[in-house]
């Protein structure tokens, strides 16, 4: 029996609301285990990688790196049609992220003699994590590697868990080739994150680590931020759907199941002002769950699901902004009314024909998104995650003279006499006298 919360939003208890809003938490529960693995990887390098790969992935590897021969075998084993689909998705992803590219350098003249600007510089190295385990995710390789390449990152590596036979799924390797990854390593979980953060005999240290993962991967990313930058916490997947009576119950239910089949910890929520739609979606979810190929995972995930009936569309929007979903679907008669009022969402899908899976694979937007409410403060993966910005100032003597009194006054007020003197020396002052 599938048990999901079905209630009027106004009747949801404080405990039930807290459970909904705190989904994806539990980092503290795995913190000690994660810390131990990271420490071992940092001190023991490749030997720790072998130990934990054998322990967690149940496979013993002599070499972590994927060879060119393995790449060629993977490519030869994929049908031309599937490879074309992969390239088509890659082209859309590349085009969308190219549109985000900033000017390499720009300048403005603030006042005569005062020229200010900004220089955009790509990071030197990035590590992309692509999950494995229950399924392979070549799409995540495209989503992480392509933006890094478009941004101009010099070195991009990929870590992904090995299969039981020690190989990597052929389509994942094909995606790495299509996207332009420099190297792929057969490493998963905490040990993969540690290897990219600290570097080992085999795996190079990177400046930044991006990509989604389970609670262990997310906890590892949070713990290594003192040695490598990360994109954001990206844990179990989630969708929130705002729908009214104009929505199709079968479509809404199928979108709930699409999210639920990711992981038993995935979260799917429908919030609607229509009792009729809510009841219809509930019935349809139960029917589709029984027929689904990944029925057991879906049924487990639906324990985290909810169908909430709101008093108004405004109440739906208010709950959505509080929930800050990874994916937000808007399936209402006036979607622009809702869109204009959305403050917190990782990626937004408007209308009956913009389901989350199209963004997962082929529309071109990025599917690496903040989860667990982090959409309140983080953006989904984009070009700016791979670029840093340096401010520039080019000031003439006359320009500095126009700022002189202001700088001196503020510096002296803060008790920084040498700051003030650094200005005065440019106008004849000799601090040594």
UniProtKB/Swiss-Prot annotation:
Cite the Gene3D superfamilies for this sequence. Answer: 1.20.5.1300, Nitrogenase molybdenum iron protein domain (3.40.50.1980)
Report the catalytic activity: L-histidinol + 2 NAD(+) + H2O = L-histidine + 2 NADH + 3 H(+)
Q: Pfam families given for it?
A: Histidinol_dh (PF00815)
Q: What keywords sit in the KW lines?
A: Amino-acid biosynthesis, Histidine biosynthesis, Metal-binding, NAD, Oxidoreductase, Zinc
* Ligand binding (substrate): 237, 259, 262, 327, 360, 414, 419
One GO term in the molecular function aspect is: histidinol dehydrogenase activity
Cofactor binding, per record: Binds 1 zinc ion per subunit.
Which residues bind Zn(2+) per the record?
Answer: 259, 262, 360, 419
Please name the GO terms of the biological process aspect recorded for this protein, alphabetically: L-histidine biosynthetic process
Which of this chain's residues are annotated to bind NAD(+)? 129, 191, 214
Which InterPro entries does the entry mention?
Answer: Ald_DH/histidinol_DH, Histidinol_DH_CS, Histidinol_DH_monofunct, Hstdl_DH
Q: Which cofactor does it need?
A: Zn(2+)
Is the keyword Metal-binding assigned to this protein?
yes
| Cellular component, GO, one term | cytoplasm
EC number(s)? Answer: 1.1.1.23
Q: Which domain of life is it from?
A: Archaea
User: Could you tell me which pathway this protein works in?
Assistant: Amino-acid biosynthesis; L-histidine biosynthesis; L-histidine from 5-phospho-alpha-D-ribose 1-diphosphate: step 9/9
Which residue positions are annotated as catalytic?
A: 326-327
Protein family according to the UniProt entry: Belongs to the histidinol dehydrogenase family.
HAMAP family associated with the record: HisD
Task of the protein = Catalyzes the sequential NAD-dependent oxidations of L-histidinol to L-histidinaldehyde and then to L-histidine.
Q: What is this protein called?
A: Histidinol dehydrogenase
């Amino acid at each position: 029996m599938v048990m999901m919360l079905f209630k009027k939003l106004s009747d949801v208890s404080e405990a039930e609301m807290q459970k909904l809003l705190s989904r994806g938490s539990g980092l503290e529960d795995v913190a000690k285990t994660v810390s131990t693995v990271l420490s071992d990887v940092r001190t023991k390098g490749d030997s720790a990688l072998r130990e934990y790969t054998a322990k967690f992935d149940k496979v013993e590897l002599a070499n972590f790196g994927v060879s060119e021969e393995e790449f060629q075998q993977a490519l030869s084993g994929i049908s031309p049609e599937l490879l074309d689909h992969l390239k088509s998705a890659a082209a859309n992803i590349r085009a969308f992220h190219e549109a985000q590219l900033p000017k390499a350098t720009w300048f403005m003249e603030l006042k005569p003699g005062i020229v200010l600007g900004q220089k955009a510089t790509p990071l030197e190295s990035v590590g992309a994590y692509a999950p494995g385990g229950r399924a392979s995710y070549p799409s995540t390789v495209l989503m992480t590697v392509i933006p890094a390449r478009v941004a101009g990152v010099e070195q991009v590596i990929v870590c992904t868990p090995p299969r039981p036979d020690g190989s990597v799924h052929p389509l994942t390797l094909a995606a790495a080739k299509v996207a332009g990854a420099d190297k792929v390593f057969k490493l998963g979980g905490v040990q993969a994150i540690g290897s990219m953060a600290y570097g080992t005999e085999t795996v190079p240290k990177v400046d930044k680590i991006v990509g989604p993962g389970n609670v262990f991967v997310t906890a590892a990313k949070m713990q290594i931020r003192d040695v490598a930058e990360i994109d954001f916490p990206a844990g179990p997947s989630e969708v929130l759907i705002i729908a009214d009576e104009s929505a199709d119950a079968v479509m809404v239910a199928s979108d709930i199941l699409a999210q639920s089949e990711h992981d038993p910890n995935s979260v799917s929520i429908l919030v609607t002002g229509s009792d009729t739609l809510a009841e219809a979606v509930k019935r349809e979810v139960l029917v589709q769950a029984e027929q689904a190929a990944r029925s057991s995972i879906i049924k487990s995930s639906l324990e985290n699901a909810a169908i909430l009936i709101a008093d108004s569309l405004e109440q739906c929007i208010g709950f959505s902004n509080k929930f800050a979903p990874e994916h937000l679907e808007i399936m209402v008669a006036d979607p622009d009314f809702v869109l204009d009022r959305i403050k917190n969402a990782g990626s937004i899908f408007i209308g009956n024909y913009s389901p989350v899976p199209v963004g997962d694979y082929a529309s071109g937007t990025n599917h690496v998104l903040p989860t667990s409410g982090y959409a309140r403060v983080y953006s989904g993966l984009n070009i700016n995650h791979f670029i840093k910005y340096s401010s520039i100032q080019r000031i003439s003597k006359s320009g500095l003279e126009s700022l002189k009194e202001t700088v001196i006054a503020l510096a002296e007020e803060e008790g920084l006499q040498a700051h003030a003197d650094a200005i005065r020396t440019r106008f004849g002052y000799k601090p040594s006298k």
